[in-house]
């Protein structure tokens, strides 16, 4: 691999000790022509990133979600996620496994898996086209009253309910907010979407699984409530009356490196269920 990029969450490595260690190990195992350290809030020319053969992301799940949201539309470089955060459910390896991970990449003992992304557009809002690796949430504000939501699938009304909101989740996001709201766990390689009401006040409002090629439209009936759309829990936009949120599978994918010894169910047991 000739060109390697590194993105690090500086809040978790203020003295650059981890960054310097990773640079040293990358040189030792992969011997690249160039190592480019990229700020996680990068605002430069994305063309500079298109030549990367590998992008190493140092942080936790939040850092990885931010990278997916910001860079997925401009580069399709395979990503090696190294956890230096807390949960680290989405990452490829822990920082303690750095040597093993880089060695596996060196000898070609790895896979590049594609993860589905969601595209979110808000009708009536300029430049609202966003990407989400986990979920898109349409929900009331903290101090708002319960709101009413209409959910359409391919322009056909699916449900109308009152509640706190609705989560539109990818398979990757099924272990996040959707899981806490009673949604199902979904294997991350599938191309499906879950629709999960949040605290619905209607007994028959239940989670729904649909094929990823379907389009979802959420129409909040805004009266006295403030309603927001939140992308991966990181970016929020307030909706105005008559705004509708259009959600569909993005044409891009999030490409992440995986190893055979890190099965989905093994990670589930360890990270989510706390079973070794």
Swiss-Prot record:
One GO BP: NAD metabolic process
Domain of life: Bacteria
Cofactor requirement: a divalent metal cation
Coarse class of the protein's main subcellular location: cytoplasm
Function: Involved in the regulation of the intracellular balance of NAD and NADP, and is a key enzyme in the biosynthesis of NADP. Catalyzes specifically the phosphorylation on 2'-hydroxyl of the adenosine moiety of NAD to yield NADP.
Family: Belongs to the NAD kinase family.
Name recorded for this polypeptide: NAD kinase
Organism this protein belongs to: Clostridium perfringens (strain SM101 / Type A)
């Amino acid at each position: 691999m000739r060109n390697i990029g590194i993105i690090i969450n500086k809040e978790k490595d203020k003295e650059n000790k981890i960054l310097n260690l990773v640079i040293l190990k990358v040189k030792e195992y992969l011997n690249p022509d160039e190592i480019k350290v990229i700020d996680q809030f990068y605002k430069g020319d994305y063309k500079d990133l298109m030549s990367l053969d590998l992008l190493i992301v140092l942080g936790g799940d939040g850092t990885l979600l931010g990278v997916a949201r910001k860079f997925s539309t401009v580069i399709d470089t395979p990503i090696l996620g190294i956890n230096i955060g807390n949960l680290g459910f989405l990452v490829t390896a822990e920082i303690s496994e750095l040597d093993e991970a880089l060695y596996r990449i060196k000898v070609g003992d790895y896979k590049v898996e594609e993860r589905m992304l969601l595209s979110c557009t808000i009708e009536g809002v300029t430049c609202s086209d966003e990407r989400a690796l986990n979920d898109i949430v349409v929900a009331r504000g903290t101090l708002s009253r319960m709101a009413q939501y209409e959910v359409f699938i391919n322009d056909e009304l699916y449900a109308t309910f009152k509640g706190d909101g609705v989560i539109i989740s990818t398979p990757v996001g099924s272990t996040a907010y959707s899981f806490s709201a009673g949604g199902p766990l979904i294997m991350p390689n599938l191309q499906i979407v879950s629709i999960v009401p949040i605290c619905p006040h209607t007994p028959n409002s239940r989670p729904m699984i649909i094929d990823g090629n379907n389009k979802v439209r959420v129409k909040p009936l805004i009266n006295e409530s403030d309603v927001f759309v939140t992308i991966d829990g990181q970016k929020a936009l307030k909706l105005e009356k008559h705004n509708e949120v259009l959600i569909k599978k993005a044409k891009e994918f999030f490409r992440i490196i995986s190893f055979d010894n890190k099965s989905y169910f093994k990670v589930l047991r360890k990270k989510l269920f706390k079973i070794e």
